[in-house]
């Protein structure tokens, strides 16, 4: 499959989905998109800018959710035009799908909604590439049913994304086997390195996180030969309005991506060990 003008999967180099969790302001979106576009261009890594106009699943009613669909899409369209990069954003059950699909290049189904059949069908009917987050409550092989629903619309541009599995209360773990298992769906596999270290509800009215583990999990995922890496970034994670505790510090990303690119090339240039 293709996102914008680049191919995804089938042993191609990994692509990056990255940006702040939520659109906090137009200026911040432009600044982060510009920086990430420059870094990925220098490194030769295909890049999709990610940020959400609405975070509908925040822990608290008082949490910042975003700028809304109209302003959010206006900003994403400006990012896309200014920096010539594809964009991805979350959609929800009350999202005007056609309106969003006119702007973005990839529609993303949140993990909590990955079992909602009618929702999945409507999203996939838009004919855009779709990234489906695996629910924290699902086994990796259960994603086959989700993919079958999605592809029943005739849309073959489906990706599946691992973002950790619930491990007791307020904790997630990443089972690296799931990345290999989900390859059996026939879809490109994406690893969400930042939500995988989230501690859901771990701060009472908001989620905590362990961003110090993002590097090690990202490197482990590269060893599996993933097709894409999802990694939320922020110029100052401690001041982020959403998911700061698990966001990667943006100004440290270039050196780290350079390492991941080397690992990705090494793994994909070697024959698979069959047992």
From Swiss-Prot:
SUPFAM superfamilies: Aldolase. Transmembrane segments: none annotated. GO terms for biological process: keto-3-deoxy-D-manno-octulosonic acid biosynthetic process. Pathway: Carbohydrate biosynthesis; 3-deoxy-D-manno-octulosonate biosynthesis; 3-deoxy-D-manno-octulosonate from D-ribulose 5-phosphate: step 2/3; Bacterial outer membrane biogenesis; lipopolysaccharide biosynthesis. GO terms for molecular function: 3-deoxy-8-phosphooctulonate synthase activity. It comes from the Bacteria. It is found in: Cytoplasm. Keywords: Cytoplasm, Lipopolysaccharide biosynthesis, Transferase. NCBIfam families: KDO8P_synth, PRK05198.1. This is 2-dehydro-3-deoxyphosphooctonate aldolase. It comes from Francisella tularensis subsp. holarctica (strain LVS). The lineage of its organism: Bacteria, Pseudomonadati, Pseudomonadota, Gammaproteobacteria, Thiotrichales.
């Amino acid at each position: 499959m293709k996102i914008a003008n680049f191919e995804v999967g089938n042993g191609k180099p990994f692509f990056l989905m990255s940006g702040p969790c939520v659109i906090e302001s137009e200026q911040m979106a432009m600044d982060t998109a510009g920086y990430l576009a420059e870094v990925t261009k220098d490194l030769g890594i295909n890049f999709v800018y990610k940020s959400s106009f609405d975070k509908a699943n925040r822990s608290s009613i008082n949490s910042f959710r975003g700028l809304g669909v109209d302003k959010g899409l206006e900003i994403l369209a400006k990012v896309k035009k200014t920096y010539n990069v594809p964009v991805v954003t979350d959609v929800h059950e009350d999202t005007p799908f056609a309106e969003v699909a006119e702007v973005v290049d990839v529609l993303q189904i949140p993990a909590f909604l990955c079992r909602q059949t009618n929702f999945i069908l409507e999203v996939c009917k838009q004919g855009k590439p779709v990234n489906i987050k695996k629910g924290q409550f699902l086994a990796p092989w259960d994603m086959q049913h989700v993919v079958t629903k999605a592809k029943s619309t005739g849309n073959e541009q489906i990706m599946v994304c691992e973002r950790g599995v619930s491990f007791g209360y307020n904790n997630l773990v990443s089972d690296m086997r799931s990345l290999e298992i989900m390859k059996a769906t026939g879809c490109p596999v994406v690893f969400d390195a930042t939500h995988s270290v989230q501690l859901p509800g771990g701060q009472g009215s908001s989620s905590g996180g362990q961003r110090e583990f993002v590097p090690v999990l990202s490197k482990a995922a590269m060893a599996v030969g993933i097709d894409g890496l999802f990694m939320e970034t922020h110029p100052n994670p401690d001041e982020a309005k959403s998911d700061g505790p698990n966001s990667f510090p943006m100004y440290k990303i270039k050196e780290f991506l350079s390492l991941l690119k080397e690992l990705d090339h090494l793994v994909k240039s070697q024959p698979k060990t069959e047992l």
